[in-house]
Amino acid sequence: VGGDLIGTARWGGVYLADVLALAGVDPAAEQLVSRSADGWTCGTPVSAVLDGRPALLATHMNGEVLSSVHGFPVRMIVPGLFGFVSATKWVTDIDVTTWDAFDPYWLQRGWAREAPMLASSRIDIPRAKSRHAAGMVTLGGFAWAPRAGVGSVCAGSRTSTRTSDTPESDSIA
């Protein structure tokens, strides 16, 4: 999961929790069913949108109006959840309902209702299957732990370890 679909962006738009408050969402609601212009449906736990995270109806990405490839005119962003339950592009409407009332696209195929992202990482340097001389190899990549954050990263072998928060001269264990 992830691969080249993981990235960083600064999103701008309207807080989804504010929209739900203005709409007077029923406290019994469990699921937001968002629909996209291409017919795709997504089920998002209402609790995830109302728990304080910055869930958005995004209209901007990195200070620019959304491009069509990123979901113009509006897309849903719910940090900490995998996209199949939180990232509808080209949003046309959102229904507030229960889980029993509707099975969105991936739920119909047996996927989970809730899909929190867990701590994980990806190594981008060196590229997969590239060849290197014996000895020290520089690693580069990303680590993420939604909602908790990442304080440091430790990469090592059986003989040495280096952490991202340790000066190089002190990093070999």
Show where each model-derived region lies.
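Residues flanking N-terminal targeting/processing segments that define the start of mature chains
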Residues: T159, S171-I172
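Structured, non-membrane catalytic/scaffold regions adjacent to prosthetic-group chemistry
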Residues: V1-V153, A173
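Short amphipathic, helix-prone segments within low-complexity/disordered or flexible regions
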Residues: A155, D165-D170
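Ala/Thr-enriched low-complexity intrinsically disordered regions
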Residues: T138, T159-T166
